[in-house]
């Protein structure tokens, strides 16, 4: 009986195999699938790119601030500590916010700046003044682009909080305005100045990691305690309305600098996906007392990007759930590895460590992180020149541990010395385009999407990312 059953099952198996159609060889071959593409407008006649744009030196950088709610006042405070500056004007829709910021300036022993408030268009009067060089914009996201364009059109440089633009149309408008007016348009991305990031960038530029092949970044920040404090629930409303990675810049900015994006390489294609929205609708019900079955932004969004030179980037976004804060910041190179969260660590091939300057190198292997003492010695040895100058002062003044102060200081330093800024309008474009492009990918079944060349052909004009310094 057992023999008969065995013969029966073998017969069934052979029959099934005989009935299967062999997989054609051609189906296993690699095929090229055209990604979704968005239009790239032609550069208007007479315009040129603003890569490494320089403008005349400013003895004193005269600044006007727009938006004095959550982030603006701390920026005003930081600027009272930066030499070679004058705070000329302050603007907020609410008069009390402008008045509080004015007291920050006068309490620092400086002349009281002019105030603009009480009207939706009061900020335009600030931009129209002839005694301002730079407009510093820290409003809600939806007003960033309009204000930046108006400032440049009225002869001012524009520094815009993250994200500076939320759509491709806004991005191209900022690019064209900067190119047309020859004014700087910089996104205020602070995380590129954090201590581990800038030190690691210096190591990478010195070749310590070999060829950097893969980088990661994220914005993972449980905003539970902050949701009630966004004016008129603007941030929750934005997440309710838009799908995709709407806040990619903190993770993507440092990653792009490591890969020399639009300075020898460019982001070419991305694929994005998200989870369903669970926490968002609950927050709307909690704070706005209404149901939100239409809530668009998934609790967790992830994006994978491939560059022209065959490098890869992984970005995540999650502001909804109880996870430890993380910007990930990770790089993988042919000779080394770096990781910031949850702990700062480096890993190298043994021959990458100089035994004359780094202790205990015999204990290193390519399979484990270097000991803490070795990590500290490396970070000291490769401390970035910017941190060598500013670390002590930055940590004293503060602003997310000091990186905000360094960001503002470097902006002023470059303007006063007539140097290219550390971040240009194309950085702004590349880091902000994730909002529109990831949405497009997700809404089309996680389809590949081509990342536009915002430089319009000049992405390899500069050989590698670098910071400018006065001679």
UniProtKB/Swiss-Prot annotation:
**How is it placed in the membrane, per its record?**
Lipid-anchor
In the UniProt record, does the keyword Membrane occur? yes
Pfam families from the xrefs? GFO_IDH_MocA, Glyco_hydro_109_C
Q: Which Enzyme Commission number(s) are on file for it?
A: 3.2.1.-
Where does the UniProt annotation place the signal sequence?
A: 1-15
Q: Where is the lipid attached (N-palmitoyl cysteine)?
A: 16
Instruction: Please tell me where NAD(+) binds in this chain.
Output: 70-71, 92, 141-144, 161-162, 190, 247
Q: Give the main localization category.
A: membrane
In terms of PROSITE patterns, this protein maps to: PROKAR_LIPOPROTEIN (PS51257)
Tell where it localizes: Cell membrane
The portions of this protein that span the membrane are none
Residues lipid-modified (S-diacylglycerol cysteine): 16
**So where does substrate get bound?**
219, 235, 247-250, 325
Cofactor(s) needed, names only, are: NAD(+)
The record's listing under InterPro entries reads: Gfo/Idh/MocA-like_OxRdtase_N, Gfo/Idh/MocA_oxidrdct_glycsds, Glyco_hydro_109_C, NAD(P)-bd_dom_sf
**rRNA processing among keywords:** no
The organism's superkingdom is given as Bacteria
**Listed GO cellular component terms?**
plasma membrane
Similarity comment text for this entry = Belongs to the Gfo/Idh/MocA family. Glycosyl hydrolase 109 subfamily.
State its role: Glycosidase.
Q: What is this protein called?
A: Glycosyl hydrolase family 109 protein 1
Q: Which organism is it from?
A: Phocaeicola vulgatus (strain ATCC 8482 / DSM 1447 / JCM 5826 / CCUG 4940 / NBRC 14291 / NCTC 11154) (Bacteroides vulgatus)
């Amino acid at each position: 009986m057992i023999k008969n059953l065995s013969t029966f099952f073998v017969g069934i198996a052979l029959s099934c195999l005989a009935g299967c159609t062999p997989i054609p060889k051609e189906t296993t071959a690699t095929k090229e699938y055209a990604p979704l593409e968005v239009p790239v407008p032609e550069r208007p006649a007479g315009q040129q790119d603003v890569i490494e744009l320089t403008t005349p030196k400013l003895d004193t950088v005269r600044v006007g601030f727009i938006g004095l709610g959550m982030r603006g006042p701390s920026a005003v405070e930081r600027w009272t500590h930066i030499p070679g500056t004058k705070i000329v004007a302050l603007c907020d829709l609410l008069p009390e916010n402008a008045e509080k910021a004015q007291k920050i300036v006068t309490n620092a022993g400086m002349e009281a700046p002019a105030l603009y408030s009480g009207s939706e268009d009061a900020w335009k009067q600030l931009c129209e003044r002839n005694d301002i060089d730079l407009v510093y914009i820290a409003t809600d996201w939806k007003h960033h682009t309009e204000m930046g364009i108006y400032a440049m059109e009225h002869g001012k440089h524009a520094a815009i909080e993250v994200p500076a633009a939320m759509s491709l149309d806004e991005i191209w408008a900022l690019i064209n305005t900067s190119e047309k007016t020859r004014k700087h348009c910089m996104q205020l991305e602070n995380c590129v100045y954090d201590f581990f990031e800038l030190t690691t960038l210096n190591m990478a530029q010195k070749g310590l990691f070999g060829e950097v092949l893969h980088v990661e970044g994220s914005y993972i920040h449980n905003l539970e305690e902050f949701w009630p404090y966004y004016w008129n629930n603007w941030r929750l409303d934005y997440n309710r309305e838009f799908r995709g990675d709407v806040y990619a810049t903190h993770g993507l900015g440092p990653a792009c600098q490591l890969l020399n994006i639009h300075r020898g390489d460019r982001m070419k294609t991305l694929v994005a996906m998200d989870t369903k929205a669970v926490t968002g609708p609950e927050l709307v019900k909690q704070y706005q007392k209404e149901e939100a079955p239409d809530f668009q932004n998934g609790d967790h969004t992830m994006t994978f990007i491939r560059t022209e030179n065959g490098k890869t980037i992984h970005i995540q976004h999650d502001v909804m759930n109880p996870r430890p804060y993380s910007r990930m910041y990770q790089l993988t190179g042919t000779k080394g590895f770096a990781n910031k969260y949850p702990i700062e660590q480096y890993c190298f091939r043994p021959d990458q460590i100089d035994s004359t300057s780094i202790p205990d190198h015999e204990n290193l292997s390519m399979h484990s992180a270097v000991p803490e003492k070795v990590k500290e010695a490396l970070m000291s040895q490769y401390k970035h020149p910017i941190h060598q100058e500013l670390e002590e002062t930055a940590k004293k003044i503060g602003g997310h541990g000091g990186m905000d102060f360094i960001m503002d200081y470097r902006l002023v330093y470059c303007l006063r010395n007539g140097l290219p800024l550390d971040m240009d309008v194309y950085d702004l474009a590349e880091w902000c385009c994730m909002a529109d492009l990831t949405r497009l990918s997700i809404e089309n079944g996680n389809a590949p999407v081509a990342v536009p060349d915002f430089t319009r052909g000049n992405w390899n004009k500069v050989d590698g990312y670098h910071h400018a310094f006065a001679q």
